[in-house]
UniProtKB/Swiss-Prot annotation:
Functional note: Catalyzes the deamination of dCTP to dUTP.
CDD domains: trimeric_dUTPase (cd07557)
Protein name per UniProt: dCTP deaminase
Pathway(s) served: Pyrimidine metabolism; dUMP biosynthesis; dUMP from dCTP (dUTP route): step 1/2
Enzyme class: hydrolase
Binding positions (dCTP): R105, S106, S107, L108, G109, R110, D123, T131, L132, E133, Q152, Y166, K173, Q177
Assembly mode: Homotrimer.
Keyword field contains Nucleotide-binding: yes
Length: 206
């Protein structure tokens, strides 16, 4: 069951669901979602002389991105073909019986601005700001202003609370994140850190 506006308001009032700060409840609550605003921090992807990015090598990932902070009232220009990581202004706490999904606002979509590439799911139990995967699919630069409404959060009620909500156990590497976070896929259990380090050292000595 997808929560309606009244359902969302009731959850917010009892603090079963946390979305904060909300400066204008009437403007941000939609018929079956809540609008989230753009934060001030961005991670931009740089051109690099690395032949390819190995997702499990933190130093390569960190070399690939740089942080930009845009004060509220100023603009971040998203150029055609650009892909950057942004963040929501709001911090959320999703209860264990809800699944949230991030959707782009239609008005931005009509300007060819996409809010997420693949990561549209916010797991039950997640706490923190939400990283946005922003891209411009159009032919003209688009000015984005921190504080503007850029996405919608839709809530689906589970048939029963999750037995292992995000943050309770395994693989919760983005729990309580603030600001946009670059990929930490290298922390996934399928990557053997010992083997990777040995291979990396071997490459550096050849």
């Amino acid at each position: 069951m997808i929560l309606s506006d009244d359902d969302i308001l009731a959850r917010l009032e009892t603090q079963e669901l946390v979305v904060e700060p909300i400066d204008d409840l009437d403007m941000q609550i939609q018929p079956a979602s809540i609008d989230l605003r753009l934060g001030e921090e961005f991670l931009e992807f740089q051109r690099t002389n690395i032949s390819c990015i190995h997702p499990n090598r933190k130093e390569e990932v960190s070399e690939y991105v740089s942080e930009t902070i845009v004060s509220e009232g100023d603009e971040f220009i998203l150029h055609p073909g650009d892909f950057v990581l942004g963040t929501t202004k709001e911090r959320v706490e999703i209860p264990s019986d809800l699944l949230a999904t991030v959707e782009g606002r239609s008005s931005l979509g009509r300007l060819a601005v996409v809010i997420h590439a693949t990561a549209g799911v916010v797991d039950p139990g997640y706490c923190g700001q939400i990283t946005l995967e922003l891209s411009n699919l159009g032919t003209a630069p688009v000015a984005l202003t921190p504080g503007m409404r850029v996405s919608q959060l839709v809530f689906t009620e589970l048939t029963q609370p999750s037995a292992r909500p995000y943050g309770a156990a395994r693989d919760s590497k983005y729990q309580n994140q603030t600001g946009p976070q670059a990929s930490r896929i290298g922390e996934d259990p399928e990557f053997d850190q010992t083997d990777d380090t040995a291979q990396h050292n071997k490459e550096n000595t050849t």
